[in-house]
Amino acid sequence: MIKKLLFSQPRPSTEHNPYTRLETQFGVQCDFYQFIHIEGLEAREFRQQRINPMDFTAVILNSKLGAEHYFRMCEEMRLNVPDSMHYYCNSESVGLYLQKFINYRKRKVFFPESGNKFEDLLPAMHRRPNEKYLMVLSDIHTDDQINMFAENGIEVTPAIMYRTVTTPWPADKPFDYDLIALFTPAGVTSLKENFPDWKQGNTLIAAFGNGTIRALEEAG
């Protein structure tokens, strides 16, 4: 019988959430623990990629986290981002988030009218054939988006500015769950690194997303 569940994500900030209802309705215990966390690369590490952010006229951002680390890196490298820089974002929320860092003007920030597909930005990109694009990424990423741009005649330079790191499991905390829910491939990696000798036994594992499923299959 499933009585104790672990979700590899932060505890919800509000009391009314699906997990509370799960506990109330079925009498189970829901625990939360972030198996991974994000660390920004230091400027000296980033320089090893031999990329100068000021050589580009546009930045491609696929998350608020990417925006934070782009401006953080520029600050650490003592670079002044020019007011003429263009920003291509995969969603409106990321685009509007830039107000935290720049004097926001619609003519220099682009995002899809709906959804979060970079493909919807291709017309705007093709109108600026001389643009030079830098794409901010994590160390864990796929090349799908970069390949999509290349297939449409747009050259993009990937720049790794932050990385996903395993969060150590507390030594005094038991790991005795009936079900473990993993949400990312990095979570699978963290589980293996934290418990290299762990045997699944009767423990159920829930995986969210095709990438996480593949990571579990590869992990055996």
What are these regions (language model features)?
Residues 1-220:
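Conserved beta-alpha
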